[in-house]
């Protein structure tokens, strides 16, 4: 994650790019969700970046994909900076900032499609030499990390399922990557 974030500080749209990556790896969002998220979904009633993503069904997969995902502190900080840029850009063009506008926009200010987000990830991982990675890799990383930390924070796999927006725990379990070292430690602790 650190290597990717370091690389993203060098891109032309670095703040947007950092937010795209963090939405995937820290919030476990799908490409479609990243493309569809609006400022309204990440702000509080006063218009400040809130403490959670209130992902609506329209932005998610299926009619029951809406969910609330607490904001990781790094993602929250990145969203605050990106929002400052977005507000300034709108005002520069003579338009008021609109909370219903998309968080992630193209260089020209238009909405990015899920396909564009998927291609963005493909280019990113290709530039970094990460073969076999896709727009879903960050989501898998987030879900695996949540699962590994669940018992430490007093949660359950049901919490991971809810964060991931899966209707079935079996689907969530398919995302969780096995760890040989963790298996060894589990056997040794009992």
Q: What is each PLM-predicted segment?
A:
Residues 1-27, 31, 156:
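Basic, Lys/Arg- and aromatic-enriched nucleic-acid-binding interface segment
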Residues 6, 36, 44, 174-177, ...:
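Phosphate-coordinating loops and pocket residues in cytosolic domains that bind phosphorylated ligands
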Residues 16, 131-149:
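Short basic/aromatic active-site micro-motif
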Residues 26, 141-166, 174:
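C-terminal catalytic core of tyrosine-transesterase DNA break-rejoin enzymes
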Residues 36-75:
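Conserved tyrosine-mediated DNA breakage-rejoining catalytic core shared by Y-recombinases
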Residues 59-61, 164-166, 170-189:
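Catalytic-site neighborhood detector that most strongly recognizes the C-terminal catalytic loop/helix
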Residues 60-80, 98-122:
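C-terminal catalytic core of Y-nucleophile DNA break-rejoin enzymes
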